[in-house]
Amino acid sequence: MTHQPSFSQAEFADKKKITRREKFLTRMEALIPWAKLLAVIEPFYPKGERGRPPIGLERMLRVYFLQQWYGLADEALEDALYDSQALQGFARIDLTAEGVPDATTLLKFRRLLETHDLCKGLFAAINTDLTARGLLLREGTLVDATLIAAPPSTKNKEKKRDPEMHQTRKGNQWYFGMKAHIGADRDSKLVHTVVVTAANVADVTKTAELLHGQETQVHADAGYTGVEQRAEIVALKRKID
């Protein structure tokens, strides 16, 4: 997909120091199979038959990824896009000709992905492409879990405390929210599987779901002590260290 940089972007590209953010974004640009991801979303994306035409799908997807990578709220992302030429370049936004997507537009795009459960399709398309390119070697899997904290006052659409969220204790600290159980390729460190549960679900109970079945080794930290004795792991005949 061709993209003509603006004069300011070309000038920015000539500077001598390359920041860590720029290196990361350059790597993501090369890794992500953009055409395949756009094909997942395109059937559900507004065509603009009525009213003003929607912002281009690729730009919205790029902005969405930036929001996820840097953990920015809608308004903070809007500000960051105005402030950072590196982010503008990745999102393919030329401020001399256009503005950045506002908070309402960002929210609508996220809801589109959620309503049609498109994130699973995006994740699957990325992993299929990485495997085909030999970037997911699939010989070993690292398993881990991370808490996704939410304010205890978080309510669902019915204005009730979300039943999918629970409290858990880690060390001396209590958390309320969800937990992401992650399986990652040992060599590339790229994530191949994610299972999301309530925060109080024990790490060991989801281990088998994080394995793709082709690995010869599984690596886990002390939080997975005793996992080898679980029936589902014994059945898989996988040694975990």
Question: Positions of the model-derived regions?
Answer:
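Charged, often Cys/His-bearing segments associated with DNA-binding zinc-finger transcription factors
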Residues: M1-W34, E42-P43
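Polybasic low-complexity intrinsically disordered regions
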Residues: T2-S8, L57, E75, Y82, ...
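Secondary-structure capping and boundary motifs in well-ordered enzyme cores
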Residues: A30-P33, R52-E58, E98-P101
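A detector of single, family-specific signature residues
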Residues: K36, Y45, M60, E78-D79, ...
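An N-terminal domain-cap segment
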Residues: L38-E58
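N-terminal core-binding DNA-recognition domain of tyrosine recombinases/integrases
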Residues: G48-R52, G71-A73, R111-E114
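Alpha-helical support elements that line or immediately flank enzyme active sites
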Residues: R59-G71
